[in-house]
Amino acid sequence: MEEAVESPEVKEFEYFSDAVFIPKDGNTLSVGVIKRIETAVKEGEVVKVVSIVKEIIQNVSRNKIKIAVTGDSGNGMSSFINALRLIGHEEKDSAPTGVVRTTQKPTCYFSSHFPYVELWDLPGLGATAQSVESYLEEMQISIYDLIIIVASEQFSLNHVKLAITMQRMRKRFYVVWTKLDRDLSTSTFPEPQLLQSIQRNIRDSLQKEKVKEHPMFLVSVFKPESHDFPKLRETLQKDLPVIKYHGLVETLYQVCEKTVNERVESIKKSIDEDNLHTEFGISDPGNAIEIRKAFQKTFGLDDISLHLVALEMKNKHFNTSMESQETQRYQQDDWVLARLYRTGTRVGSIGFDYMKCCFTSHHSRCKQQKDILDETAAKAKEVLLKILRLSIPHP
């Protein structure tokens, strides 16, 4: 059964980053959880990262996705919501419709076709002299995950302003043209030509304001199984996981990236101080292969760690040896650095040539060590991002 509820009080939100809002009463991305991820990344415990991310994803999977339906008054937003839910206007839990303004405040509807989704019917824009900016502020548009901009008869300046604001806020949005049945019944053009004309008009209006192209659907609320309605439902079903987890993945990656960068800066200080032996137990600072293996282990990219990640994620893509990658290149280049190192510290070397060789040796050694470190850190970020993306459930 479809359900409708009156607009509840909006929960307080704690702003954590540009990517995601965190409910104050929730623990999905609490400070403690973030610290656990930072510690795991810093210590190279990639398997622990997988475990923590799984916990977070499981918690988020129970969260509702908030979809706001908005547009000018009279565009048929309530009728569109009923058609999207595949219920008639006369049914008990349908959104009220009529020629007068029927939606006075944000109202939430549910549908068995879209579990874990809240469809919010917002009051139409344009019934008063209220600006788009004040309207969006009053509707608290920032709390919604997806905005559906509904238009009919004309794609007005208000619709364009809505799209501009959504792009500026980095909000995902769809454009839906309703009342297509009326257009088809009154137009003298063939149907394909009329559809192209409507699409071109919307696209041109948005392109003039440098709004990137977003999904666009032409529908008739009286034919919820025809025109672009099936395509709209299919697109929405595919987008729901992305909508639900995109901000979360972005935020988690920012945490991981920041932690990796901090670890890199710390190791570079050890390189400058010629202290890799103490910190990593490296016996030969001129041995590029030994250094690379030590750095890979530090970031959890050694074969054993990646094998454990593959088992934990049940994904064979992580079960490939990284220790064997680029080995041949380092074996070819390593003798040059090693020879410089040995020559620079040879007891028999004296005077200016000795000092010059020592400087050259130290400079070359530090440069190669930092190059290896940067390559390993970049690979660590790739692996962490892959873990986050592959952790997202798909329908």
Curated annotation (Swiss-Prot):
Tell me what happens on changing C358A: Abolished localization to parasitophorous vacuole membranes or Golgi apparatus
* Reaction equations catalysed: GTP + H2O = GDP + phosphate + H(+)
Q: Which protein, by its recorded name, is this?
A: Immunity-related GTPase family M protein 2
Q: Which residues form a coiled coil?
A: none
EC annotation?
3.6.5.-
Does this entry carry the keyword Hydrolase?
A: yes
Subcellular location field: Cytoplasmic vesicle membrane; Golgi apparatus membrane; Cytoplasm, Cytosol
Family note:
Belongs to the TRAFAC class dynamin-like GTPase superfamily. IRG family.
Q: Which organism is it from?
A: Mus musculus
Q: Record's InterPro entries?
A: G_IRG_dom (IPR030385), Immunity-related_GTPase-like (IPR007743), IRG (IPR051515), P-loop_NTPase (IPR027417)
Swapping K379A leads to an effect described as: Abolished polyubiquitination
**Matching Pfam families:** IIGP
Which lineage?
Eukaryota, Metazoa, Chordata, Craniata, Vertebrata
The top EC class, named as a word, is hydrolase
Q: Please state every residue range assigned to the domain named IRG-type G.
A: 63-239
Consequence of mutating C357A? Does not affect localization to parasitophorous vacuole membranes or Golgi apparatus
Q: Which UniProt keywords apply?
A: Cytoplasm, Cytoplasmic vesicle, Golgi apparatus, GTP-binding, Hydrolase, Immunity, Innate immunity, Membrane, Nucleotide-binding, Ubl conjugation
